């Protein structure tokens, strides 16, 4: 109960953990008792749970501003994200599901060190490593598996639990946060971008707004094809003039306040859409 945001909240409430069997019923009960008409989530691990319960909330007059299961599956699973981007004709870093696959790619000079190893269903840079040799890569893989086993991510992949790690080329260059906004029916609204100047614990610490038609084109393709609901937080890297989409999160990201301060009031848009 010590999150900084609570200083600005009207009420402080401690809910059970998202893995608690009573989590949804407690949220529903609290929302009804306090006449809450809409709920958003900032937690990646909560999205799959909420997306499967949208009808339950709608039946009691509450709108969950959460995308459907298809969208959450694509954005929560970084491998499925890569496959979706490929289908859209968009650039993304070369990505591999196994140590054997990336070792083969390195042997064939299709990729070179330094590489990135991270959890397939990770969040906030959990478990990310940057090995610079084969030995480091093997050791980092074992370390990440151990870290995953000690967190809630150990159950995130379901039947894919054996492929919990992704291996990826490291793209050096400018990094951007890109918000792709759809309305509550999944219709594309706009794309808003900020260049990240510094990071802290996986979140944007300093940034400047960017206006660039290349991002608008990418955002429109993603928003139109994905048909997510509300804000989609994307990480984009630039190398040699080309843009690579790294990740997509079907929620507000830590960099949203920068867009808000520059005049993009997405929260206000939500309220307007909810009021009809």
Where are these regions (language model features)?
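ATP-binding N-terminal substructure of ATP-dependent carboxylate-amine bond-forming enzymes
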Residues: 1-66
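Short, charged, surface-exposed secondary-structure boundary motifs
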Residues: 5-7, 22-25, 73-77, 125-128, ...
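ATP-dependent carboxylate activation and anion-phosphoryl transfer catalytic cores
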Residues: 13, 34, 200-201, 210-276
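Short hydrophobic patches on amphipathic alpha-helices
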Residues: 31, 106-108, 223
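Active-site nucleotide/adenylate-binding loops and adjacent lid/helix of ATP-dependent enzymes
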Residues: 72-165, 172, 184-185
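Phosphate-binding site of ATP-dependent enzymes
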Residues: 141-224, 237-238, 242-244
